[in-house]
């Protein structure tokens, strides 16, 4: 049953006479308190905040003076008291509330400056279970929510970034309703995000990826100029997950990344991370979240050249992801072509100097590579809901490949198969990828018909061969990967016509036997992975 409101009109201006300050992040708190004190505002504080203000020589009362009760249980209980919450929640123009305050000696609190225990930080650093639990704030969120609910009379500030706007607002000693309402909205968003982080942490600890209530929280890193298109508004929210990538990378040069830059850079870096840096240098070039070319080689510069060769036309204005430190030789190759973003685990000083010749080129150092096997979640909004799933962390190296044809693949074909399947995992469905000797030969993406994807990939391979001055297409003697099963033999026959000699696919079609028979008829080796990689 809903609680009835007395509907007492909120005043516009509220004079600030008493302020409660209780913060974990003490950035700027002494300066703020000094400014409040200069305005004759009474300061009340708790624990470490009280000590910081007292040490700064400021006149500050301990919260126990409001409660008549000492801080107990290692600080777990200090503000959970009617003396505090009555002062925050009282409707000042309600006679009954005013009488209750008078009867119980409750002081009205006009301003609350509160931030929370660093749960997100402790969780991100991998704190042990008891330490992480101990950093779940109880009193802080309670005071924030109480203050925000009573924003008709109380101003709540939860972010040090709002200290300056607060001081501007109270230049005449009062806050206006519009300001208090805005701060209340920010406060509820803060506690919601805080609780979301706690809830999601417990879901991880208990291995419950799909709990009854799933809250997706994040902190606005930046408002973007626009979204996918200029008429769409956009913002970049970060979750606090420390997975190396575009959200955690350092921008070494270049202007702000756009919405599309971030989306494409994430896709590129997740793809190139499939290739272990200790095994071989690798490069992936991405446009519109699809790979144009991917390659490994003895050197990073050669890997870039081989990736570029697959589709140099589409690579123009693309995103380049590397699995090793960007060196000067590779940088010299990259600056020959217009590129939007480069992301690598690190960047050498010599490479920075080279890239600096292209000041608009965005250069990111991620500090490492994401582990493709790490569990996580992805989300997609739909009308009226959110689709949530675990990250596709399936790895072809972990699968038991099943040879289903008379001819088994050669050792080289098997390597090419695995390479192609890794790439196909990151191509929009329907996906077909030809690969040979650690290089994509042709990529067909996003077609409604799988056979059309095979044909497009073959056309790309022919165009690449012509550009390279080769007599035959790159698909000759290649392996071909399909991210989902081949429903008919036509897709296989198209790949065979392009020159593929080996096929890797999940299998599982009602017509598997028909497809296997076609492969045997053309002496093509085929393996089933048993794992699909749809990508939409």
Curated annotation (Swiss-Prot):
Keywords per UniProt: Hydrolase, Multifunctional enzyme, Purine biosynthesis, Transferase
Domain MGS-like: 8-158
The keyword Hydrolase belongs to this UniProt entry's keyword annotation: yes
The reaction(s) this protein catalyses: (6R)-10-formyltetrahydrofolate + 5-amino-1-(5-phospho-beta-D-ribosyl)imidazole-4-carboxamide = 5-formamido-1-(5-phospho-D-ribosyl)imidazole-4-carboxamide + (6S)-5,6,7,8-tetrahydrofolate; IMP + H2O = 5-formamido-1-(5-phospho-D-ribosyl)imidazole-4-carboxamide
InterPro entries: AICAR_Tfase_dup_dom_sf, Cytidine_deaminase-like, MGS-like_dom, MGS-like_dom_sf, PurH-like
MF terms in GO: IMP cyclohydrolase activity; phosphoribosylaminoimidazolecarboxamide formyltransferase activity
Secretion signal, residue range per the UniProt entry: none
Stored Pfam families: AICARFT_IMPCHas (PF01808), MGS (PF02142)
Superkingdom: Bacteria
Record-listed E.C. numbers: 2.1.2.3, 3.5.4.10
Transmembrane segments: none
Gene Ontology biological process: 'de novo' IMP biosynthetic process
Pathway: Purine metabolism; IMP biosynthesis via de novo pathway; 5-formamido-1-(5-phospho-D-ribosyl)imidazole-4-carboxamide from 5-amino-1-(5-phospho-D-ribosyl)imidazole-4-carboxamide (10-formyl THF route): step 1/1; Purine metabolism; IMP biosynthesis via de novo pathway; IMP from 5-formamido-1-(5-phospho-D-ribosyl)imidazole-4-carboxamide: step 1/1
PANTHER family noted in UniProt: BIFUNCTIONAL PURINE BIOSYNTHESIS PROTEIN ATIC, BIFUNCTIONAL PURINE BIOSYNTHESIS PROTEIN PURH
Family of this protein: Belongs to the PurH family.
NCBIfam families noted in UniProt: PRK00881.1, purH
Domain writeup: The IMP cyclohydrolase activity resides in the N-terminal region.
Protein name: Bifunctional purine biosynthesis protein PurH
Species this chain originates from: Rhizobium meliloti (strain 1021)
Organism placement in taxonomy: Bacteria, Pseudomonadati, Pseudomonadota, Alphaproteobacteria, Hyphomicrobiales
């Amino acid at each position: 049953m809903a609680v009835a409101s007395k509907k007492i009109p909120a005043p516009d201006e509220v004079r600030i006479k008493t302020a409660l300050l209780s913060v974990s992040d003490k950035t700027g708190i002494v300066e703020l308190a000094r400014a409040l004190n200069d305005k004759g505002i009474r300061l009340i504080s708790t624990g470490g905040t009280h000590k910081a203000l007292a040490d700064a020589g400021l006149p500050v009362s301990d919260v126990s003076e409001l409660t008549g009760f000492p801080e107990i249980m290692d600080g777990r209980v200090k503000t959970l008291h009617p003396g505090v919450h009555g002062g925050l929640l009282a409707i000042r123009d309600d006679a009954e509330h005013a009488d209750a305050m008078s009867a119980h000696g409750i002081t009205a609190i006009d301003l609350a400056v509160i931030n929370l225990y660093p749960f997100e930080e402790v969780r991100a650093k991998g704190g042990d279970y008891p330490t992480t639990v101990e950093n779940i704030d109880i009193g802080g969120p309670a005071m924030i929510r109480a203050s925000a609910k009573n924003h008709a009379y109380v101003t709540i500030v939860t972010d040090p970034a709002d200290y300056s706007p607060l001081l501007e607002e109270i230049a005449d000693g009062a806050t206006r309703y519009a300001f208090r309402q805005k701060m209340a909205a920010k406060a509820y968003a803060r506690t919601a995000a805080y609780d979301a982080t706690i809830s999601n942490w417990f879901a991880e600890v208990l291995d419950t990826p799909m709990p009854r209530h799933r809250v997706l929280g994040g902190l606005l890193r930046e408002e973007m100029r626009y979204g996918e298109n200029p008429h769409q508004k956009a913002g970049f929210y970060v979750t606090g997950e420390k997975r190396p990538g575009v959200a955690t990378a350092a921008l070494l040069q270049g202007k702000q990344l756009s919405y599309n830059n971030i989306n494409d850079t994430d896709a590129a870096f997740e793809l190139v991370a499939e290739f272990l840096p200790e095994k071989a240098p690798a490069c992936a070039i991405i446009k519109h979240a699809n790979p144009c070319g991917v390659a490994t080689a003895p050197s990073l510069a050669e890997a870039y050249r081989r990736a570029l060769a697959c589709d140099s036309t589409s690579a123009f204005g693309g995103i380049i992801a590397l699995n090793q430190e960007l060196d000067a030789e590779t940088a010299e190759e990259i600056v020959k072509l217009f590129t939007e973003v480069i992301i690598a685990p690190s960047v050498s000083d010599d490479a920075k100097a080279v890239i600096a010749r292209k000041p608009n080129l965005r250069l990111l150092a991620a500090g490492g590579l994401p582990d493709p096997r790490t569990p996580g979640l992805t989300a997609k909004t739909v009308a009226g809901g959110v689709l949530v799933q675990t990250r596709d962390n399936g790895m072809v190296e972990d699968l038991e490949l099943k040879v289903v044809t008379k001819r088994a693949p050669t050792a080289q074909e098997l390597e090419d198969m695995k390479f192609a399947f890794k790439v196909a995992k990151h191509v929009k469905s329907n996906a077909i990828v030809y690969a040979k000797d650690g290089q994509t030969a042709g990529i067909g993406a996003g077609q409604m018909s799988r056979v059309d994807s095979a044909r497009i990939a073959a056309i790309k391979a022919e165009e690449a061969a012509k550009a390279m001055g080769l007599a035959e297409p790159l698909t000759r003697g290649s392996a071909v990967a399909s991210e989902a099963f081949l429903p008919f033999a036509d897709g296989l026959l198209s790949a065979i016509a392009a020159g593929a000699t080996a096929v890797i696919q999940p299998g599982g079609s009602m017509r598997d036997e028909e497809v296997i028979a076609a492969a045997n008829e053309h002496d093509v080796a085929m393996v089933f992975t048993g794992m699909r990689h749809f990508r939409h």
